[in-house]
Amino acid sequence: IEVKSPVTTLYVIGNGFDLAHGVPSSYSKFRDWLGKHSNLRKTLETYIKNDALWWNLEEALADLDLDTPSMAIPEMLDAFDAYDPDAQMADYYAAIDMAMLPVDTITNELPKKFRRWIESLKVDSSVKPLSGLVKPGAKYLDFNYTEFAETLYGAKGVCYIHGSRKNRKAKLILGHSYKKYVSDVSVKMPRFKD
């Protein structure tokens, strides 16, 4: 984001923006969109042991239990008779693939279905609760995947932190917890004058 003037207004937009405009964009709505019998939903709920899964999906993805599928490998090898002297190499690989299927489901299906859901979100263009508050020439840092700040308020040069659904070739970034990598972060914030 290029700021040409020290008095430029910066709007930081999160999911509250879409929700305030009547867009059903909470992760619990994504869960509902998947449906009760969705293989992806069942896999997420089985392998992510986090009570906040559907309220904080991005952070919950960091809690993906990779040990459980790995521990299932010996069981699958037995089920596919991969230890049998007459077993083929294909039996061994089939057992490994079956044990790792949950990880594959999450890493491959989740991005596709998430994008499809994001692309299905619509906004009523007559609902503009922020009319009169948005300043011309402002800059926008948008954590959403939707372009509603642009379509409703004419925002220009929006920086989409996690990607935008408008760019169909780009991947949307989902999941960003650093808690396993950063144990203690201390940041000194500068003091600002009013």
Predicted features, each with a name:
Residues 2-194:
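SIR2/sirtuin NAD+-dependent deacylase catalytic core
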